[in-house]
Amino acid sequence: VKREIIEKYGGWKFFLLTEDIQFTVKNIIDGEKIGYCKNAILFDEQPVTFKQSWSQRLRWSRGYIQVALKYGAALLKGTFVKFDYSCYDMTMNIMPLSIIGITSIVTNIIGLILIAIMSPENLVPAAWIVGKMIFGLYMSFFVFGFITMVTAWKKIYCNPVRKIFSLFTFPLFMFTYMPIIVASLFKKVEWKQIDHT
């Protein structure tokens, strides 16, 4: 980040739960060029426990909602009026997981409840369809993980057995985002220190 960018805003003025995403979105809306750097190396520390991971992802989910509420209209305007690809890219980054995830959960639960009440004999076939959808989602996450693993194999620093094992557990990890997204709508979420590796 250029110093001039920070000075333009009069210092760091980004304090939502995902301040890095907020900063990026604000710059895109203001017309700054944000780009992909193929050779960039990201050093990321991971939470030590699943509970800490849950807390971190709860904060991220709530932060994405905050950013969507604050900047969503401007991003949509940039996408559909100015045809700005960067606005589209960030819209797809911040909105789909929460909106599609919550819509999917609510729709499936309501659908199963209505079927159970109005047509109990169709509950098993309906549950079977939902099960197939869940399996399809699992396979989608598996394929995304596989593509990532193949393209970044040498940059993932763990033994090959663990890499392969993670292909099968990654979709399960991603499934835990569904209750996190729902919880982020109702639970008061604040920033707190997360121990990392």
List each language-model region with its residue ranges.
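Hydrophobic, aromatic-rich transmembrane alpha-helices
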Residues: 101-119
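Juxtamembrane C-terminal module of membrane proteins
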Residues: 73-90, 113-197
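Amphipathic, well-ordered alpha-helical segments in soluble domains
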Residues: 67, 108, 178-181
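DHp/HisKA dimerization-phosphoacceptor four-helix bundle of two-component histidine kinases
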Residues: 59, 97, 170-173
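Non-transmembrane catalytic domains and loops of membrane-associated enzymes and transporters
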Residues: 1-83, 95
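Internal, well-ordered alpha-helical scaffold/interface segments
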Residues: 89, 93-97
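Select subsegments of transmembrane alpha-helices in polytopic membrane proteins
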Residues: 96-104, 137-139
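Alpha-helix/helix-capping structural signal
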Residues: 4, 40, 112-113, 180
